[in-house]
A protein has these predicted regions:
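Anion-binding alpha/beta catalytic cores of soluble intermediary-metabolism enzymes, centered on
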Residues: 1-161
């Protein structure tokens, strides 16, 4: 059985970052708030900053301390576009098309991981599995010699009383 407490202890010793592309969804905001309170993963929310703060306020969660990134104002967008064009060069990617694609939070978030800016990404609350996995396959790909991809869904249900 997985020892969740040991995992949390390891994360607290060496905190990591997690990109959350669906930054305005109340469930994602709740998760970010819990991560901040638990002090073991630093959430990076993607979305228009005002919209993320408004959603957090409406949902009643404190996300102070979370980083919020907006694709349209990201300071390293030119570098990101260049790298994305290099990765997708065989598919005829242009800078104009890359800028449009990178407005999508799943593509933007995946490029943040590819560029080494952050450690991990978790998505799929508002988007389908394919919309979440496709950017990872196109940008990061699979391990050499491995062509199998899998996803995982975790469900938490209340304990019976």
């Amino acid at each position: 059985m997985f020892d969740f407490d040991s995992y949390i202890r390891l994360l607290r010793e060496d905190p990591k970052t997690i990109v959350l592309p669906e930054g305005t969804d109340p469930r994602v905001i709740e998760a970010a708030s819990r991560l901040l309170a638990g002090n073991f993963l630093q959430p990076i929310l993607i979305g228009e900053e005002d919209a993320v703060w408004e959603a957090a306020q409406e949902a009643g969660y404190n996300i102070r301390g979370a980083k919020i990134l907006t694709p349209s104002t990201y300071e390293k967008m030119d570098e990101m576009v260049e790298q994305f064009c290099e990765i997708r060069a065989k598919k005829g990617m242009t800078q104009e098309k890359a800028r449009e694609i990178l407005k999508d939070p799943n593509y933007f978030g995946t490029m943040l991981i590819k560029m080494g800016e952050y450690d991990s990404l978790l998505g799929g609350v508002m988007h389908s599995v394919i919309d979440t996995i496709k950017p990872a396959l196109e940008i990061i790909g699979t391990k050499e010699g491995n062509n199998l991809v899998s996803s995982c869904i975790g469900l938490v249900r209340p304990r019976a009383t």
